[in-house]
């Protein structure tokens, strides 16, 4: 249903088909390669296709993106159908920044909060995209200490951190809870944050960074409540270019209805509909890739893949146990982090020149 910019007559669209002197749209192999064919067609998925209208020239691939978001929001993360907004972002870093941007503006608009009254609250193991968001959005970032062995947030240290922040004028908190940190695969308990903040009578919004664990944890821990069935969870991000093995960069931002409009850019007047995203123009080919992967596997096929990964991880951990090599691993994740004291430096590369350390 997309406009064919190679053969159709069209004017006035924010679109650009790939140069046909370099990228051949009639190459025979494209018939059996939907993602590559879409890549050449280059649909512009500018805007948010779960909220209001969008550029009508790309309604076909926009519908595929909406279906991908529905599968992730409803089937993966237990959201009620039609009660979510979101988009396929150029990566998890942008998706996390988008989440914090939405919450900052929510507090600005609904509480008349000043930026110096808002703080980001996250663990020491949180991804570096969060300090980026702190810098870009002019918000202070508070690092909650974690236990060295368990990687769990220290409740007492967290309480002291929040009390000090309140005494320094902080009134509103943007909480980032990790669904598998990049370095450890550790999973935060969101209740550690929310119980404390509610007990202190503080306003907050809770975001789940599932960039790594989003395609693993819902299938490896079927009893998990780190999803939209928990009314305290307002948004979730996932990276499809990690465990789903979609092309770089393919992140996903999901949130509850009533939030994303806080970042409406009214100045984007030439765009049909409303631009509620950080990136603006983005390729629709990523949506096709994610759709193909999800529907090729299906829920049972994906569950099987994750189960095999966990079996291999369990096997690897047993070998480490036999060798008395200490490590950290969340039982529901496929990341194993070894203690540096038990790694032979001879076989690790030096960060400076990539040569083996001696």
Residue ranges and their predicted role:
Residues 1-83:
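N-terminal entrance/gating region of PLP-dependent enzymes' catalytic architecture
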Residues 48-57, 81-87, 140-146, 172-179, ...:
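Glycine- and acidic
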Residues 53-64, 91, 122, 150-153, ...:
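Catalytic cores of large soluble enzymes that bind and process phosphate-bearing ligands
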Residues 65-72, 95-104, 130, 290-294:
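Buried hydrophobic packing segments
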Residues 90-262:
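Conserved PLP-enzyme active-site core in the AAT-like
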Residues 219-222, 226-323, 328-330:
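Active-site C-terminal subdomain of aminotransferase-like
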Residues 324-346:
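Conserved PLP-binding catalytic core of the aspartate aminotransferase-like
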Residues 347-358:
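Single conserved hydrophobic/aromatic residue that forms the stacking wall/gate
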């Amino acid at each position: 249903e997309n406009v064919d910019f190679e053969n159709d007559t069209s004017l006035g669209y924010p679109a650009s088909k790939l140069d046909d002197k370099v990228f051949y749209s009639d190459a025979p192999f494209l018939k059996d390669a939907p993602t590559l064919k879409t890549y050449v067609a280059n649909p512009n998925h500018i805007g948010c296709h779960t909220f209001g209208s969008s550029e009508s020239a790309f309604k076909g691939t926009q519908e595929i993106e909406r279906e991908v978001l529905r599968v992730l929001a409803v089937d993966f993360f237990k959201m009620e159908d039609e009660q979510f907004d979101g988009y396929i972002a150029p990566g998890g870093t942008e998706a996390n920044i988008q989440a914090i941007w939405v919450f900052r503006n929510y507090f600005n608009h609904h509480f008349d909060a000043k930026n110096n009254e808002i703080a980001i609250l996250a663990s020491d193991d949180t991804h570096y995209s969060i300090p980026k968001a702190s810098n870009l959005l002019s918000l202070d970032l508070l690092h909650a200490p974690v236990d060295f062995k368990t990687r769990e947030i220290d409740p007492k240290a967290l309480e002291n951190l929040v009390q000090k922040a309140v005494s320094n004028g902080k009134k509103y908190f943007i909480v980032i809870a990790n669904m598998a940190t990049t370095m450890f695969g550790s999973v935060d308990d969101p209740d550690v944050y929310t119980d404390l903040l509610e007990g202190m009578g503080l306003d907050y919004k809770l975001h789940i960074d599932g960039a790594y664990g989003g395609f693993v944890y819902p299938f490896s821990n079927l009893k998990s409540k780190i999803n939209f069935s928990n009314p305290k969870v307002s948004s979730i991000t996932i990276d499809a270019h990690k465990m789903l093995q979609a092309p770089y960069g393919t992140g996903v931002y999901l949130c509850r209805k009533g939030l994303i409009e806080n970042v409406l850019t009214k100045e984007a007047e030439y765009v049909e509909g409303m631009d509620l995203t950080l990136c603006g123009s983005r390729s629709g080919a990523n949506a096709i890739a994610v759709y193909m992967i999800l529907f090729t596997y299906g829920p049972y096929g994906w569950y099987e893949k994750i189960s095999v990964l966990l079996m291999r991880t369990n096997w690897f951990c047993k070998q480490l146990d036999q060798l008395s090599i200490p490590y950290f691993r969340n039982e529901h994740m496929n990341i194993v982090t070894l203690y540096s004291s038990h790694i032979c430096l001879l076989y690790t590369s030096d960060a400076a020149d990539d040569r083996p350390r001696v």
